[in-house]
Amino acid sequence: MYRMPMRFWLTAVVMVVVGALLLDTASASYIENTCRGVMGNRDIYKKVVRVCEDCTNIFRLPGLDGMCRDRCFNNEWFLVCLKAANRDDELDKFKVWISILNPGL
């Protein structure tokens, strides 16, 4: 029976780990790059993202989370989600937070 050298297996494992780390970093930066003002405002970002997460849990629609986050929460889906999460009374606060996450708009 043919045995693969230990060096081959070690190289394969290292490549898989590095690939997984790069993929994870790339997907995280894609999410964060949709909002230019995230850096330094992660606490605000987490509060706004929570609305989209709650909405996704309420409706269970595929892709709803992405539609809610589209254009850094500056869209109609976010407003629908805010209402669905019974947080529409906080609309003014969320508008301020979204403007902080979207500097220059």
Curated annotation (Swiss-Prot):
Q: Which InterPro entries match?
A: Crust_neurhormone_CS (IPR018251), Crust_neurohorm (IPR031098), Crust_neurohorm_sf (IPR035957), Hyperglycemic (IPR001166), Hyperglycemic2 (IPR001262)
Q: What is this protein called?
A: Probable molt-inhibiting hormone
Q: What PANTHER family does this protein map onto?
A: ION TRANSPORT PEPTIDE, ISOFORM C (PTHR35981:SF2)
Tissue expression from the record: Expressed in the postmolt, intermolt, and premolt stages of the shrimp eyestalks and the brain.
**Which Pfam families does the entry link to?**
Crust_neurohorm
What keywords sit in the KW lines?
Disulfide bond, Hormone, Neuropeptide, Secreted, Signal
Presence of keyword Secreted: yes
> What pairs make up the disulfide bonds?
C35-C72, C52-C68, C55-C81
Compartments it resides in: Secreted
Q: Which molecular-function annotation in GO is an example for this chain?
A: neuropeptide hormone activity
Principal subcellular localization: secreted
